[in-house]
Amino acid sequence: MKFNIIFSFLLLPAAVTVQAQMATPATDLYQQTSEVNNIMVQYRADFGSLSRFYTVTNSPERRTRLLGIVNQYINTLKQLNYDKLNTGAKVDYVIFQRNLQQQLSDLQTEEKEYKQITQWIPFADTIYAIEKTRRRGAVPDGQKIADELNNITKSIKSLQKKLAGETGIQVELATRASASVNGLREALANVYLFYNGYDPLFTWWVPKPYKKADSLLGVYANAILAKKISINPQKDDGSGIIGNPIGTAKLIEGLQYEMIPYTPEELVEIANKEFAWCDKEMLKASRDMGFGDDWKAALEKVKTKYVPAGEQPTAMLKLYDESVAFIREHKLMTFAPLAEETWRMRMMTPRQQLVNPFFTGGETFSISYPTDDMEHEDKLMSMRGNNPHFSRATVHHELLAGHALQQFSQSRFKVYRNFRTPFWTEGWALYWELLLWDQGFPKTPEDRIGMLFWRMHRCARIIFSLNYHIGKWTPQQCIDFLVDRVGHERANAEGEVRRSFVGGYDPLYQVAYMIGGLQIMAMKREVVDGGKMSYQQFHDNFMQQNAMPIEMVRAIMLNQPPKKEFKTNCKFYKF
């Protein structure tokens, strides 16, 4: 494939050090650490200690202490002499600074929203005071606590009537208020667990008023959440999927955080260009199969080539063995023997398949295939959607050199870099789909159609998820798009859309596959095609950097240190 990918600025002279895959006593210290690491370790420990001590969700006391520690470490980081840091340490500085600023912003948002919801939790300070004295085991005034709990119950009943008259509460405020009520409920539960049965007067006075207050707090939290209204309110369009579109401004904010210098509209344009390439290649494969330009008929034929029930694990292992042998033969990457030895298999439950209709991976390879108690049509859709030709594109995505190798490497190289981003996680796994296509891994037209199906799917993910979040498409339109434009089985398309919008994933998660993959492919063109490293050196080095935005991996690979006040500017795609 000819990728329309460039980097938009001239390369600087770079001295790139290729590290050995496994550490040895002679290995440079920077293989595992940097000057910024020391601060990061201290921050993580301090933040954790405070979070575990001040446990009440959204409480002012907790927020004040966390704001204090974040600001303290922002100032500590500024005291480092940035100019004297090496490139890897500068990358750590830039990303850690970004994370601290984001943490600060999140806490400030929490404070702003909390001030707007205090009318719904007028009893909060009473509970905070009860919880605070419990921390050091003060002798409780059982009768006083019982009186306070009784008053809280009365207050909640009054608030429930007030809430019933509300037409709605902005989703962010409803979510914050509900979480705060649940936090207060947990605080009371901790007090009750600590004293009840141990302190005689507490045990005599408190149980009945506590149980009433506890029950009402749970009901009240749910009632508040039920009143949430979105800026872009969603009704059930028949799909049963009701998510929360975040809007263009939030998407752009997220893209800046992930160091992606493109707008949502530009990313959709990238997806459409990649889709057009897939269309051309799909027609070629369809003709080679004897179906002419009727690529959907060719796709249907490929779907019928599923393996019988009970044989999917064996078929997947065969594909895994082929992909690992191919990567070795072409000297694309080093695999530690332990990484090959210790990945595991399991079968996905029918319930999990509603959200993940295809297999998932990592150290545990979870196989999606029908069980005996599934409906007949669901069985066939699962088998058709997980046929070996489709899976040829994704077994290496989930195992080696994809997610399983990522998990293996992340626990062994620069483990302090917990800069998790789907553009690294999913981008790397998708990159291997692109690379193995270019290297000739698909053997037959059926293999090509299977791999193209998944590449079209990655393009479609960008298009449907961004159109949904900017308010253009409904979930049902997204499902129909996957069925009509990509050729998905309808049940699989529904599962994919459900997973995207109500599965707890970041709004940019589905975008990250193809965009992250294209970023890495662009870097490969600079580093490998440019003669700076071999494939094996490039891929081994990439894994040793651990998770971070791809632009920062590139800075390390090319020894091009980022500026202290960094702003993403690395354009990697030519329109």
Give the role of each language-model region:
Residues 1-27:
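Bacterial Sec-dependent N-terminal signal peptides
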